[in-house]
Regions:
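Extreme N-terminus of proteins, especially the signal/transit-peptide cleavage junction
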Residues: 18-20, 27, 60
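Outer-membrane beta-barrel porins/channels
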Residues: 22-37, 41, 79, 84-97, ...
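A generic secondary-structure signal marking the coil-to-beta-strand transition
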Residues: 17, 32, 62-66
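Gram-negative bacterial Sec-dependent N-terminal signal peptides
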Residues: 1-21
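Short strand-turn segments of transmembrane beta-barrel domains in outer membranes
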Residues: 38-41, 65-74
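Glycine-rich nucleotide phosphate-binding loop and flanking beta-alpha elements
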Residues: 59, 74, 130
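Outer-membrane beta-barrel pore proteins
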Residues: 41-45, 51-64, 112-116
Length: 419
């Protein structure tokens, strides 16, 4: 039997508090843009890190430039009122409140650009656009639903932008994306303490962008990052060295497409305002399914499935910037980030919920070549209730419920150098 592991969105409980974007998308790719809660990121092009949202923005940056950035993501998350019910209706377990489910993480990024001539520009970006790590205690009441969820990624994007007219710029990029996934959970009502599934893949996508400058004060940008369809290869192992569970697996993991549109307007020499809309196409995430080529104790294929049924999400943000003097710039922003998960589809790996961003940032122009940016964001997520069902087969299924609360702080720094 063909081994399949459909991981169309390897995600984890409160991942959105770690990444603070719906699903497992890490929006933190620009310290400058973060100061405005990413308002106008698709049109801003204040430095080359904005090309993550719109590759056409390369044409606003003359000569050769480099941007180095890093975001420190510090989440707080808790699960309360944890209950597990067996398939026969009996109470399987009642767990204590769980804290420190998610852990701090670092998301680095680097972008370089070069102007070929008056119209043509090239660039290269290295980002970590998707990722999370979440870990429950192995003995928690809902361990059949998930213990550890770990997803890491790296994307290299060669870019090209062309100034078609004095007002219109167009850009294209190729995403070269690597992902690595690691999942653990108990099985058969904890008779098997830990089952580990792990895999990795390297696949490709693309990026498109357009930037229209109405005048020197007003510009509008449109960006698109394609879905990347990954085919992971790896293995599944059980801690008790059970041959039926120790086997090679293949996997499908699709990172979603994203469309964005942004506007930026300079009111005067001091004040600027900006707005952003982003849509992430999570609706391709229908279920999380493990199917092995060996039989379980019932004589049927080993199957573990959780229906996800994610929806496409919307992200809205508004921001303003104030140029305090020739060197210092103050940035402010607020955003509303919609959850990809509906109540009926929440799981311990993905109890996502809507959230609000509050951001502030500073820019410092040291000289004509060197500048620095810093951003801080506090994100408060709505309380998330979960009541979910997972099954390996008709004889072994459990229901888990819990209440989740989470928030996060994000600190971002970057340095930009114009050679």
């Amino acid at each position: 039997m063909k081994k399949v592991l459909t991981l169309t969105a390897l995600s984890a409980v409160l991942l959105s508090s770690t990444a603070m974007a719906s699903g497992f998308h890490l929006r933190e790719q620009s310290a400058a843009a973060q100061g405005n809660a990413f308002a106008g990121a698709t049109a801003g092009a204040e430095n080359i890190s904005y090309t993550y949202f719109n590759v056409a923005g390369l044409t606003r940056h003359k000569g050769t430039q480099m941007n180095l950035g890093m975001s420190y993501i510090a989440p707080e998350a808790a699960a309360k009122n944890v209950h597990v019910v067996n398939n026969d209706g009996s109470l399987g377990a009642r767990g204590s409140d769980i804290h420190n489910i998610v852990h701090a993480a670092v998301s680095p990024n680097i972008t370089v650009s070069h102007q070929i001539n008056d119209k043509s520009f090239i660039g290269l970006a290295i980002n970590t656009p998707y990722g999370m790590i979440t870990k429950y205690d192995q003995e928690w009441a809902g361990s059949d639903h998930g213990i550890t969820s770990d997803l890491k990624s790296a994307t290299i994007t060669p870019m090209f932008a062309y100034k078609a007219t004095d007002k219109l710029s167009l850009g294209v990029g190729m995403q070269i994306q690597y992902v690595w996934a690691h999942l653990t959970n108990s099985s058969m009502g904890k008779q098997i303490p830990v089952v580990t599934s792990e895999g990795n893949a390297l696949d490709f996508g693309y990026q498109l962008g357009a930037l229209y400058e109405f005048n020197e004060n007003t510009r509008l940008g449109v960006g698109y990052r394609s879905q990347v369809r990954h085919k992971l290869k790896g293995d599944m192992k059980a801690t008790m060295n059970i041959p039926l569970l120790n086997q090679d697996i293949s996997a499908k993991l699709d990172t979603p497409a994203m469309f964005s549109v942004g506007a930026h307007h300079d009111i005067n020499d001091k004040w600027s305002v900006m707005a952003e809309y982003q849509r992430v196409f999570w609706s391709s995430f229908k279920n999380l399914t493990f199917v092995g080529d060996s039989m379980n104790y019932t004589g049927k294929p080993y199957i573990s499935q959780v229906k996800e049924n994610w929806r496409d999400t919307n992200f809205w943000s508004l921001g303003t910037s104030y140029q305090m003097d020739n060197q210092w710039k103050l940035r402010l922003g607020v955003a509303y980030d919609q959850s990809a998960v509906r109540f009926k589809d929440r799981t311990p790996r993905i109890p996502d919920s809507d959230r609000i961003w509050y951001s502030v940032g500073l820019g410092y122009q040291y000289n004509d070549k060197l500048s620095f940016d810093a951003g801080y964001t506090y994100i408060k997520a709505h309380k998330a209730k979960m009541n979910t069902f997972v099954t390996e087969n008709a004889a072994n299924s459990v229901n888990a419920s819990a209440d989740y609360t989470n928030s996060v702080q994000i600190f971002a720094l970057s340095v930009n150098y114009n050679f």
